[in-house]
C-alpha cells in the first residue's frame, strides 16, 4: 500500500474513463467491445492456423504466433476493466490492482519491443543468408529469443512499476484515464516524481533504442542485399516479405515513443487518452491483418483448412480478412 497525504493509506483509485455522457457510453462500449472481440478472434485464429499447418512451422511464424499471444494478453490487461467501467458505476480499482495492471501492460509492451527486434533479425537471416537460415535461426535460438524477450520485458516493467508506485499519492485519487497508465498515475503523486521520470525514461530508452537498433541494422543489411537482386520480381518479393513487419514496427514504436519518451511537461491527459486507445486497443487488432493481408502462405493455409472443414468458412471475420 502507498501512503497518501496526512499519512492516510491509499487502498484504491477511481478511473475516470473516457466520457461521462450516457449516449457516448453506449457507443464507446459497443466500439471497444467489438475491437476486443476482433482482437481475440483474429489472433486466436492466427495462432490456431500456424499450429495446425505444418507448412507454417517455421521461425517466422513461430515469432508471429508469439506476437499474437502477446497482443491478446496486452489488450486483455486493460480492455475487460475498461468495458466494465463503462457500463457500471463502480469505477474503482485497488492500489494493488492498479500496480498489477500497469506491470502486466508495460511488461507485455516491452516484451513486444524485443520480439519485434527478434523478428527483424529473422527476416535478415532469411533474406541475407538463405542457405544458412536454418543454422542461424534454429528452434533452440527461437526459444531463447522469445524467453529472453519476456525476461527483458517484465524485468524492465518491474523496475518501472516499482519506481512509480512507491510514491505518496494525493487525494481524491482520481486517475484521469481508462487504465492505470504512467502519466495520469504520476500526476497524483504528492512527492517529487523526478527520479521516477528519469528511471522510466532510461528504461524506455534502453529497451527502445536497443530494439530499434536491431531493427534498423537488420533492415540496413536487407536493403543492401535486395538492391543487388537483378530480378525485379525477386526484389518485389523480398520487400513485400518485410513490408508487413516494417508497418507493425512503425505503428508500435511510433506510438510508444510518443507516449513515454518525452518530458512530463508536454503531457496532455485528454490528448494522451486518444493515443492510448490507438496503442492499447487498435494496434493489437490490426497486427494480424497487417501480417496476413498479403501473406500467400497464410492464405493457402486457410484455404486448406476450409477444404478440410467447410464449417470454418462461417467461423469468424478472420476468414474474410485473410482471403479478401
UniProtKB/Swiss-Prot annotation:
| Subcellular localization(s) per the UniProt record | Cell membrane
Gene Ontology CC annotations of this record: plasma membrane
Q: Which residues lie on this side of the membrane: Cytoplasmic?
A: 48-55, 122-134, 219-238, 294-324
Matching entries from Gene3D superfamilies are given as: Rhodopsin 7-helix transmembrane proteins
Instruction: Write down the PROSITE patterns for this protein, in alphabetical order.
Output: G_PROTEIN_RECEP_F1_1 (PS00237), G_PROTEIN_RECEP_F1_2 (PS50262)
Residues in compartment: Extracellular? 1-26, 77-100, 156-197, 260-272
Chain coiled-coil ranges: none
The record describes its membrane topology as: Multi-pass membrane protein
Give a GO molecular function annotation for the protein. odorant binding
Function of the molecule: Odorant receptor.
Q: What is this protein called?
A: Olfactory receptor 5A2
Organism (species): Homo sapiens
Protein encoded by which gene: OR5A2
